[in-house]
Amino acid sequence: MAGNRSFRDYVADQFYNEIFAAIQGFTADNYDDLDLRLYRVQNIGSIELSDIEVKYVSVNDLPDMKIEFDVAVEAELEVREADYHYDESEFCKQWFMLKCSGDLNCNLDNFTISSVTEYTSKNRQSRPMSDSLVPIINKEQLESVATDFLRRYYPEALIKPTAVEPQVLAEKMGLVVEMREITKDFSVFGQIYFHDCDAEFYDEDSDEMVLTHVDARTIFVDPKAYFLRNLGSVNNTIVHECVHWGLHRKAFELERLYNSSVTRIKCQVVGGI
């Protein structure tokens, strides 16, 4: 998967027209109540939206692939004087906050703006996500996040202290684990596929990469990890890929909004064997 993508940039580009129309409608209906800094216009007769700039997007994680997010926008407005004796107009800038939501399972095709208000302050999200749609987890939250993960996928570990079996965890998450050589040089020892695709794997018999159909929700672990590393490395790889599925699917789907051909996250070997 490529480097971190910006959700703010995506929203600003893809939903510019929707955001513009929402603010235009709000200012037209509420211009008498807007707290605008005007110097020449005394009584607002009309107001027209000239341009907008998305300043930041604050995202809150929701169940499944849904998200809700606040979009802070700086708008440039042209304001005209109501008194026809004065042919006055001036430009001013005002910030607005838009509450939005969408589902990444449908590529945000159901993008919705539920409200528009004048900006006052940044809202605190209960389950905040970064601009690349990765959950923001503070050190103090690690235990609660781990507990929630186990409650959803491995609840018996919370009832009686027990080691988490990676293969069982994967099955409980609806994932399939397959042992297969991935690259010739063992530069990648684990991969998880989020979407069906045709992918290349190293074939030792022919000593070349071969194209193979792969189903979504499949984890591949290179069996050389058993011999060149150890069983713990294999187990850690499986758990690592499970965590990708549980916590990073939204970041992955953001990447696909930019590049629809992306299908997997891979774990590379760092350093020597």
Regions found by a protein language model. Give the residues of each.
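Active-site hotspot residues in diverse enzymes, especially metal/ion-binding acidic/histidine motifs
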Residues: 2-273
